[in-house]
C-alpha cells in the first residue's frame, strides 16, 4: 500500500497541501523509513512526521501544542510513533476545543500507558482501571 502518489508531482503535492492545510514554509519530502536517518543530518530544524500521522492520525499544521507537549513528556520523536498515538492526542485536543477543557499530557498518561513494541516502536495502551 503506497502513498507516494500523494506527493509524486507538483499538482498532487499542491492538492495535498490544500487538503491538509500544510503551509508553504513546511517542506514535504516522501522518503522511506530507512532513509530518515540520512535526511536527519542535513538540517537541525527538521522534524519528521510519518505520512500516516497526517492521513490517519489527524496531525495538522501548525502542529498542535498538545502533540508537542506529549512528545516532550514521553521524550519521543514524531517518527517513533504509530498513527494511533496521534489520533488519541488529536482527539483529546479536539475535546479541549469543543468543551473548553484543559486536558494535557498528564491526563493522557493517566488513561494510557506508553508501551514499546519491537516492530512498531511505541504505542499507547489503555490502563486497567
Located regions from the model:
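Residue-register detector that marks a fixed positional context within folded domains
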Residues: 1-129
